[in-house]
UniProtKB/Swiss-Prot annotation:
Keyword Amino-acid biosynthesis part of the UniProt annotation: no
Subcellular location: Cytoplasm
Name listed for the protein in its UniProt record: Hsp70 nucleotide exchange factor FES1
Chief place of localization: cytoplasm
Domain of life where this protein originates: Eukaryota
Entry GO MF terms: adenyl-nucleotide exchange factor activity
Underlying gene: FES1
GO BP term (any one): regulation of translation
Recorded GO CC terms: cytosol; endoplasmic reticulum
Entry annotated with the keyword Ribonucleoprotein: no
Repeat region (ARM), residues: 74-115, 118-158, 202-243
A Pfam short name: Fes1
Its job: Functions as a nucleotide exchange factor (NEF) for Hsp70 chaperones which accelerates the release of ADP. Required for fully efficient Hsp70-mediated folding of proteins.
UniProtKB keywords: Cytoplasm, Repeat, Translation regulation
Length: 284
């Protein structure tokens, strides 16, 4: 409160130097002082705005953007479950007449809330949201929505076995498609594969990756040397596969080694640990 008092005095006097020194005030303290709504109330009100039939699309977008900013805070992200807001969000996402713009924002909210957050992963797992995300991720006619849905799925299943088990049961592995050459799409697919591998690699998954020619695809990304983010992610997945005892064939090793030679000139821009681990994975 003392900092808030100093900030208020500096604000009223127009003392810019003092304002810069003090920094921004704590939002919760401001709300307590001026009687504004707390963040939990703001979250609930945002969803009410989106559910209303009397509100413009623009205002609904603003409400969801504000909601996403709030849930960047871990406590607020966990409050989605505490406030029982997951199901309303999924209901809005699932409605056919919900504008694409809102669906994109909701997928972003899901991905942000569950990212590296076990509590929110568990809460989201209690909903039917994953099924809806997988359906949206299959629609390549709405690229931005597809991309955000893939982001949300990857965030949800990363290092979370119950979520991955549901993903597998819902045949989410069918989302892996190497035919689309859009860089952003490829990056989303590689992120999804990395999230899958964060839960381990059994014989069935090894066989599916063999059949899908994953190592060949990773090698092709390295050989193209066109996008540093894609190269970095591909090297990371090669490293993950090696750590999980994936047995690369001689042909796979040859292709990946050739790709590594192509990208070695980018070493200053790449994760050096992943580069070295990828070399080790295919050297023997």
């Amino acid at each position: 409160m003392e900092k808030l008092l100093h900030w208020t005095i500096a604000q009223q006097s127009g003392d810019k130097a003092a304002l810069e020194k003090i920094g921004e005030p704590d939002q919760k303290a401001l709300n307590q002082l001026f009687g504004g709504p707390d963040e939990a109330t703001l979250m609930k009100e945002s969803i009410k705005v989106v559910e209303s039939t009397d509100v413009s699309l623009e205002d609904k977008e603003i409400a969801l953007e504000n909601f996403e900013m709030l849930i960047e805070n871990l406590d607020n992200a966990n409050n989605i479950g505490n406030l029982k807001l997951w199901n309303p969000l999924i209901d809005i996402l699932a409605k056919e007449d919900t504008p694409v713009e809102l669906k994109v924002l909701i997928c972003g909210i899901i991905g942000t809330a569950v990212q590296n957050n076990p509590k929110s992963q568990e809460d989201f797992n209690e909903t039917e949201g994953l099924s809806e995300l997988i359906e949206l991720a299959q629609d390549d006619k709405k690229f931005e929505l597809q991309s955000k849905a893939l982001f949300a799925i990857s965030s949800f299943i990363r290092n979370f076995q119950p979520g991955y088990a549901k993903f597998e049961k819902l045949q989410g592995l069918k989302l892996i498609n190497f035919d689309n050459k859009n860089n952003k799409y490829q990056l989303r697919i590689l992120s999804l594969i990395s999230s899958i591998l964060s839960n381990g690699l059994d014989d069935s998954l090894k066989a599916q990756f063999k059949e899908a020619k994953l190592p060949h695809y990773l090698a092709s990304v390295l050989n193209e040397d066109s996008n540093t983010s894609l190269v970095d992610k591909s090297l990371n997945i090669v490293s993950q596969l090696n750590q999980l005892n994936y047995e690369f064939s001689l042909e796979e090793k040859y292709e990946i080694n050739r790709g590594i030679q192509v990208v070695e000139g980018l070493s200053e821009k790449l994760n050096i640990d992943d580069l070295n681990n990828a070399k080790q994975a295919t050297s023997s």
